[in-house]
């Protein structure tokens, strides 16, 4: 049985009174997750990757149908965590255990207009809480060296580079790499 991360509620975000909730995704969130992840992927990789590669990744990984299946938390994946404000998904992320004591952040994206508000940190905290409850002592994430949005975010939260590997979905001879970042987690 997966541990349910607690729901965090915040008011007074930015200038107005808004209600922000961090929670496990529900089937009704699939379209919003797809929208946020597609927008985040495009914003992150525009000018770094070819437009056709960007759209191919979005079509494969961020299609609402796929996300609906993933909300059910298949083996190795703990399900999606969402940031919802006024019934709108504004951020989403998820991870899973890759081996005993070792967790991975597989995805974390926000509406690009909402970066810098602490929402990504809240999603990461919820994923981390979920993984610690499952016994994680290490937390890993793959980030491409050109990802000038993701790298500073993870460095600021204690992740350090521990190597590199071929970028997900590419062959080693293509030369595309992802940095492997890790931070140690305190047991619960």
PLM segments and residue spans:
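N-terminal amphipathic/basic-hydrophobic helices that include classical n-h-c signal peptides
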Residues: 1-16
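A generic "structured core" feature
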Residues: 115-117, 125, 144, 148-151, ...
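Terminal substrate-recognition subdomain of acyl/acetyltransferases
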Residues: 13, 177-188
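Conserved catalytic-core motifs of GNAT/GCN5-like acyltransferases
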Residues: 140-143, 155, 160-179
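Acetyl-CoA-dependent GNAT
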Residues: 10, 20, 24-30, 35-113, ...
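Short Asp/Glu-rich motifs
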Residues: 76, 150, 173-174
